[in-house]
Amino acid sequence: MHVVTLRDPSSPLVAQFVPEAGMIGTSLRDDGVELLGQRRGLDAYVSEGKTMGIPILYPWANRLGDNTYTAQDVTVTLTPGENGVRADPNGLPIHGVLAAYPGWRVTDETDSGLTAEVDFGADPRLLASFPFPHVLTVAVRLADRTLTVRTTVTATGDRAVPMCFGFHPYLQLPDAPRADWVIETPPLRHLGLDDKGLPTGGSEPQPAREEALRDKAFDDAYDQVAEGAVFAVSGGGRRIEVHFEQGYPAAQIFAPPP
């Protein structure tokens, strides 16, 4: 597989993406220090959909409440194991249908930028799971010590395209023990979840917070994320920020047990 390496012109920051493995970001290194969690690696992502690095979860992030969904007056029945659908331990469709999808087409590549697209209307397997013809474009750029990911969805049919996707960056600070990491979150609304990880309808406001991670674990859902909101993790003299610049009103904070 062709790995595209991007270099920041103004710093030792280097990023790598693999378009033919789902346009996944596999590495973000600062002067050789890896800042993305590698987990089981690219091979497990390609063969089993086990996430690592920065995968795109599309056309839905997280899990659906059933194997049937309705959007834009269209009802779709999904079958885990078919047409890109993967199931969580409870049998619910999770993280969309593009895990390791090989059909991305690179439309632009420079030393510090990469753009690739998927035409949903051209692939019957994708349309079987998400029957809304459109072109999905992801553009990444590395500059000024910032990796920017911009996503564009352009409808190519008569139906509007439902939006429920996201990215799943796995961040790490190799210079500090996990227990010493400090996480910062903006003001949010915390959503109640049941034992399957599905929203219950309950919620409560959560003010901006800063706390040591220690031995805590999270898999929590939030909405009312303001445009420009900043999430951060710091430790060992290093700080990584994630900026929700535009178009992402919801978030999931995930920190598996140590």
Where are these regions (language model features)?
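A short, structured loop/turn motif at beta-sheet edges
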Residues: T70-V74, V106-L114, R141-T146, D175-A179, ...
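Extended, loop-rich substrate-binding clefts of extracytoplasmic carbohydrate-active enzymes
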Residues: R86-D144
